[in-house]
């Protein structure tokens, strides 16, 4: 497959360490970042982290803060209104997946740089040049701005709720399926397949898989492993120029459930369930994936997430329609209701 131009979008600098939030002014100086800043953050815990960031900004820095708690197009518009008022040099996204997604999409739409400062290791959007924004045509990722820099403070990340940490593990292990789906599409449809980016995504998944052995014993070391895996996954997407290395049938299932059951479930939790199911379809050892996730307290049954059997089965039957241009193990026609029910029961997602 001949491609005239392939653009790789990567962060310029990645800072990972303990208590590094106190060195933000040094990092900004190294990168030539100057105020005014527009800080995008959440409304609760993440706002407290944002306050600590503000305390450590360069002396006399000018800044404005906007708080959001969802990742909708309306939230993006709210940020853009403040952008017009403040005319910032750069955006700082301080929060979880929703905050960082809104920040990077607003940065993309307004031709601005942004710095990613995650407060939970729940998503690989920390690094990637893609965002998931509700209110667009479909519940899939759209092109956004890659971060100029990432500042990942292990002390902060390891204090995030365990449910969010587990969701990050579920999201990252899913790359095992994404890469297999990508390889399948290359073989059957002649789709472009990047060996290097696929290997990087797969390495991220294996790293997260190893994390399941450590996280219960040493939370900080486990979170460091996880954040490195999440960052690598985001880099793989930036190198591929698409979400292909990190999003396959397991993500299609997650997006389908989100359409049917839009509230109360974390994206990474749904990806984890989808990974178990799609591992079965790919003929790989789904039991070991399920067992590893279960040992860290990950919800491996639909009912643990408040999902009905019907929602799971329905999601499996419509998953292939979420991104029909993206070929996966689900094929063009998807699964019948009876097949979907059988697979969900065999993998113990439903009883």
Curated annotation (Swiss-Prot):
The family this protein is said to belong to: Belongs to the glycerol-1-phosphate dehydrogenase family.
Protein name: Glycerol-1-phosphate dehydrogenase [NAD(P)+]
Keyword Lipid biosynthesis: yes
UniProt keyword Plastid, yes or no: no
HAMAP family: G1P_dehydrogenase_A
Assembly and interaction partners: Homodimer.
Annotated Zn(2+) binding sites: 171, 251, 267
The species this protein was found in: Saccharolobus islandicus (strain Y.G.57.14 / Yellowstone #1) (Sulfolobus islandicus)
Coiled coil: none
Residues reported to bind NAD(+): 97-101, 119-122, 128
Annotated metabolic or biological route of this protein: Membrane lipid metabolism; glycerophospholipid metabolism
Recorded GO MF terms: glycerol-1-phosphate dehydrogenase (NAD+) activity; glycerol-1-phosphate dehydrogenase (NADP+) activity; metal ion binding
EC number(s) on file: 1.1.1.261
Pfam families: Fe-ADH_2 (PF13685)
Keywords assigned by UniProt, alphabetized: Cytoplasm, Lipid biosynthesis, Lipid metabolism, Metal-binding, NAD, NADP, Oxidoreductase, Phospholipid biosynthesis, Phospholipid metabolism, Zinc
A cellular component term, taken from the record's GO annotations: cytoplasm
Major localization listed first in the record, in broad terms: cytoplasm
Obligatory cofactor(s): Zn(2+)
Catalytic reaction equation(s): sn-glycerol 1-phosphate + NAD(+) = dihydroxyacetone phosphate + NADH + H(+); sn-glycerol 1-phosphate + NADP(+) = dihydroxyacetone phosphate + NADPH + H(+)
Cofactor descriptive note: Binds 1 zinc ion per subunit.
Annotated localization: Cytoplasm
Residues binding substrate, per UniProt: 124, 171, 255
InterPro entries: G1P_dehydrogenase_arc, G1PDH, Glycerol_DH
């Amino acid at each position: 497959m001949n491609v005239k131009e392939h653009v790789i979008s990567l962060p310029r600098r990645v800072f990972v360490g303990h208590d590094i939030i106190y060195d933000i002014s040094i990092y900004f100086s190294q990168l030539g970042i100057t105020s005014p800043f527009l800080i995008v953050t959440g409304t609760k815990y993440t706002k407290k982290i944002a306050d600590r960031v503000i305390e450590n900004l360069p002396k006399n820095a000018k800044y404005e803060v906007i708080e959001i708690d969802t990742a909708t197009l309306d939230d993006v518009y709210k940020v853009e209104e403040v952008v017009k008022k403040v005319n910032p040099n750069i955006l700082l996204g301080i929060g979880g997946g929703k905050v960082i997604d809104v920040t990077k999409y607003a940065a993309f739409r307004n031709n601005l740089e942004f710095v990613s400062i995650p407060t939970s290791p729940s998503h690989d959007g920390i690094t990637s040049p893609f965002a998931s924004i509700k209110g667009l045509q479909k519940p899939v990722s759209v092109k956004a701005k890659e971060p100029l820099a990432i500042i990942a403070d292990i002390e902060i990340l390891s204090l995030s709720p365990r449910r969010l940490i587990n969701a990050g593990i579920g999201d990252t292990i899913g790359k095992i399926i994404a890469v297999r789906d990508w390889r399948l599409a290359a073989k059957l449809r002649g789709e472009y397949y990047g060996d290097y980016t696929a290997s990087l995504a797969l390495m991220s998944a294996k790293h997260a898989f190893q994390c399941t052995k450590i996280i219960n014993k040493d939370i900080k070391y486990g979170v460091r492993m996880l954040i490195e895996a999440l960052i690598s996954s985001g880099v793989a997407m930036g190198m591929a120029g698409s979400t292909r290395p990190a999003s396959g049938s397991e993500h299609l299932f997650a997006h389908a459930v989100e359409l049917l059951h839009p509230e109360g479930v974390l994206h990474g939790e749904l990806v984890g369930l989808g990974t178990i199911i799609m591992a079965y379809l790919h003929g790989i050892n789904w039991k070991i994936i399920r067992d590893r996730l279960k040992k860290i307290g990950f919800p491996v049954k639909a009912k643990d997430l408040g999902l009905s059997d019907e929602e799971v089965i329905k999601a499996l039957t419509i998953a292939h329609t979420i991104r029909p241009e993206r070929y996966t193990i689900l094929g063009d026609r998807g699964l019948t209701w009876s097949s979907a029910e059988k697979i969900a029961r065999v993998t113990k997602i439903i009883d």
